């Protein structure tokens, strides 16, 4: 005789809808269990469901010969999005069986292991983000872990980068998904007629968000279909496209592929982000657990990179993860039903005690089941990782821990989630300490289809031994740990006289002008600490490195090579005998671009190593900055304050290191004078190359000054003027008359003109960077200059959130002064905060063979909405300046040599060339081709030339299309386009790397069977993509899958036959 299953009495038509809070359903259902016991019944969504909350009952339901998974409730509503996907199909639906057979291998142990590097890449982005934001930044824990896990599943499973950490807002898929999950939960407890008729507005919005999710999935599939060779690994997407049932040979339809793409994006990141969020809640509220977990990482990993080999050895962290999932299974319910084909119309559970009708849903409440005191004891609600160590975990009663589901319908991505969770936890504990943003925070549960902590925020602080300048190198095993200098030293007074200044030499290498500007700023800061610094190029110091004073070196690395004014110095230094610099005291600061991993900071590190080899004594740890962060000047200042000045014993000073200029403003006249650092060229023509509405790209022809020479591939350095609109803003702020004249006293440590009059207009237009983002020191100085408490507090907040509020928004000193009128600084003080105007470099787009007296440039005009939120336009300083030049105008220029190999080959008859570019990266190759035109007209039989060009549309921004077409007809070059917005006109290729892969036989023949030289010019993203596809062609040609072999071959190729020019 069976017993009646208890439960609260419902209302007509709507049943028990009012008994369940859709916003907090899991907690609500658990409370009902507390009232009605381990089994109860509710009428929800138009049907009666049974809810269980004991280990004994779920153990019975886990018998797959009697029961199977039932898709119901919110999960059934999710079928509106992904139909009969692997996650949402009923067990007897053919689509589930087919997808399961095809996709199981894609989640096997070897496949998951092969995803480690991509997981590590995404995890490193999170680590670097938290490091850069600093300990004052408030971290939305669930939000950032959601970005992490979404990007990881997208990259690992479908080779797609959502780049969530580089966007302020969530990816559209995530925002739509959250809306859909929330509404699916609400729809699950409402009768169908209520959903369809009463909530029509919600239904319309629901369908719109579903359409967004499906569109994104369709775009991913379409991209892969259009470029099937773009991804050579057998990722999940390729498995869905190419996989077949081993027995029937049947594959997944596009519709089924889209369904499963969506469900993997949902299930593959929602549950794991919740797990990590709950874990860090417990780590932060249990210091003893945190200490043990961090100690395990320190002892196992140390300061090296976390590797795949560490994953199986993080036993305590694994226990923490298990215990977290016990208390908070992020997929909090499993719904069962009697197995299809079961003969009886009904069955029983509970030892025959409770009757279950055919197809009736039985919901296992995992939060309650996994806290069953019969299994876990009286402390079942406490977080105790020790109960989840391997030996104890393996001896637990069957089916008492089921966060990944049951049997054959269990989570197919369990191994993926586990590896990802172990990796990110280890990396975060290795590098950070954490604290709650609100010390009084009490755990809140936020529920959609899964559960996460609600309103959970924390702070992350780099551990004492972690050097933020070398963090990224450490993550990837490319840098050694830097030392930490403690304790301030007494500083020099600003009142130091010229006679009291100690000597210092600052040596720099610079082609773009950035490091030169940094060297000048360091000299100004040095004066405030008692040093009179001499600033020189590195080449000028050959055989002249002083031994009686500190020597500070500031240098970049250009694709692993020294800048042009440091080449001789590097050669000289490498040839020195050991101990040749025995009495030299030095320190090095380097600039680099992290996109070039193999050559990142090569020259600064080489300089440091060679000085040490030659017996010099290092003053302070080498500083390494990354220009891609966009805050290189603030990083440089931070290195000075944290490393250089404390090591020299002048950590602090009585005043500001950036001495204010005692400028006398003469309002009576306008004797204007402009200092010229380069020779004057004359504009012959200036034309727009793109159609209206497209990003503006231009082409200018310049008559060079007499005697100025260049080679194809060289750069032209242009000294620009600030836009008059920006200059006018300064005049308005400073309340200067338009003909004001200023004088900077002679002897002031600056690169600006001193000891003579100069018009304020000329000074502001041509000598200082008005749009450069403010530095941290600028903010502190501005705050100290305001008598207004509100302004001081506001500026303090800006400084606390510097990366997000200043650097990312590119707020200049002028922007801040306009926003906070209470700041009271002089015009001279304002000028002292600004770095000097620096030249910008552009690849020359012509050949001197055609006309040695002229040079042409091709560039994109930067004109976009300002990140500051001011409503103004952000105008690129030099690109805007060049765009405004007209015939007859004069512009200050100088030639800068390209990298040694970035020129047409000296033996063009025997060496083919392959050129790849995106956008205005075409510039140097136009020069190459113009040179070939001249050579062919001279009767030379040249080796083949191939040009791969990436742009948007053949009619709107295919630059110099007619000229190139004529050259192709003349046999000068064979051109292969990739149109991102018209790929049907470029063999289905959207990007230059796609076209290279499409023509890989040509590239293979040139690089492997011939002696072609490969040139690449474009942005860092395109450069990396082209590099990757060339390596892929190598692996495809050799039949090798080893990344190390491809990397070794590629490094050899770069020595002589692969050359790149990357622009910002």
Swiss-Prot record:
GO terms for molecular function: aromatase activity; flavin adenine dinucleotide binding; FMN binding; heme binding; iron ion binding; NADPH-hemoprotein reductase activity. Its cofactor is FAD; FMN; heme. It catalyses: ilicicolin A + NADPH + O2 + H(+) = ilicicolin A epoxide + NADP(+) + H2O. Keywords: Electron transport, FAD, Flavoprotein, FMN, Heme, Iron, Metal-binding, Monooxygenase, NADP, Oxidoreductase, Transport. Pathway: Secondary metabolite biosynthesis; terpenoid biosynthesis. Residues 504-644 form the Flavodoxin-like domain. The keyword NADP applies. Residues 676-905 form the FAD-binding FR-type domain. Induction: Expression is induced on AF medium. Its EC number is 1.14.14.-. Ascofuranone is a specific inhibitor of trypanosome alternative oxidase (TAO), and quickly kills African trypanosomes in vitro and cures infected mice. As an essential factor for trypanosome survival, TAO is a promising drug target due to the absence of alternative oxidases in the mammalian host. Residues 1-484 are annotated as: Cytochrome P450. Binds 1 FAD. Binds 1 FMN. InterPro entries: Bifunctional_P450_P450_red (IPR023206), CysJ-like_FAD-binding (IPR003097), Cyt_P450 (IPR001128), Cyt_P450_CS (IPR017972), Cyt_P450_E_grp-I (IPR002401), Cyt_P450_sf (IPR036396), FAD-bd_FR_type (IPR017927), Flavodoxin/NO_synth (IPR008254). GO terms for cellular component: cytosol. Transmembrane segments: none annotated. It comes from the Eukaryota. Heme binds at residue 411. FMN binds at residues 510-514, 588-620. The record marks 271 as: Important for catalytic activity. Disruption phenotype: Impairs the production of ascochlorin and ascofuranone, and leads to the accumulation of ilicicolin A. Residues 485-1064 are annotated as: NADPH-P-450 reductase. Bifunctional cytochrome P450/NADPH--P450 reductase; part of the asc-1 gene cluster that mediates the biosynthesis both ascochlorin and ascofuranone, a strong inhibitor of cyanide-insensitive alternative oxidases and a promising drug candidate against African trypanosomiasis. The first step in the pathway is performed by the non-reducing polyketide synthase ascC that produces orsellinic acid by condensing acetyl-CoA with 3 malonyl-CoA units. Orsellinic acid is then prenylated by the prenyltransferase ascA to yield ilicicolinic acid B. This is Bifunctional cytochrome P450/NADPH--P450 reductase ascE. It comes from Acremonium egyptiacum (Oospora egyptiaca). The gene is ascE.
